[in-house]
Amino acid sequence: ITARDLDLTFTTNDGPVHALKDVNLDINKGDFVSFIGPSGCGKTTFLRCIAGLETPTSGDISVNGLTPDQARQARAYGYVFQAAGLYPWRTIGGNIKLPLEIMGFDKAEQAERVKRVMDLVDLTGFDRKFPWQLSGGMQQRASIARALAFDADILLMDEPFGALDEIVRDHLNEQLLKLWARTEKTIAFVTHSIPEAVYLSTKIVVM
């Protein structure tokens, strides 16, 4: 991921709001990069620019050598939000395979990928459970599995453990590091916690 002279200004009734200004950054393949800073400093906005969910006012950003829109079409990244965002009427396995259904994978491939990513996040055997039957931490692991299901190179994570208690968060951080070591994904991780960023990251970006 490469950003050069990236600016993003929002127009509001109270005047312009400069969400990002002169951002220059390189994230290399296999890096685990954490973004920290106070609320409103642009951490989530930058992640949304990577994902093509926000359009910069000026400057350039590329993902695997592609524009953010091209990278999205190429399935270059998975996105994990602070809320797990699981559909309550679908089983855990059904939630994880949803993007695979949308992308047109055949049923055999869907089943194989769901099993593989559930094993990766230590949710083996929970595929027929519904979200309400799982703890908050387990639901978030299912959300991570869903983002991994289509085998994207990059994982974008926006405060994925921010709503969880400290003991659960520490456990999930350990699991995330093991997952990163096994998959060699590139991870961009937004957090408010300096200790969490120090524990997880190969690089920390202060915004």
Per-region residue spans from a language model:
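The feature captures the beta-strand-to-loop junction immediately N-terminal to the Walker
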Residues: 36-38
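Conserved signature/switch motifs of ABC ATPase nucleotide-binding domains
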Residues: 129-132, 150
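Conserved ABC ATPase "signature" region
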Residues: 97, 101, 108-126, 178
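Conserved ABC transporter NBD signature motif
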Residues: 59-69
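Helix-to-loop junction immediately C-terminal to a conserved catalytic motif
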Residues: 51
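Short coil-to-helix segment of the ABC ATPase nucleotide-binding domain corresponding to the Q-loop/switch region
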Residues: 90-97
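Catalytic Walker B motif of ABC-type/P-loop ATPase nucleotide-binding domains
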Residues: 155-158
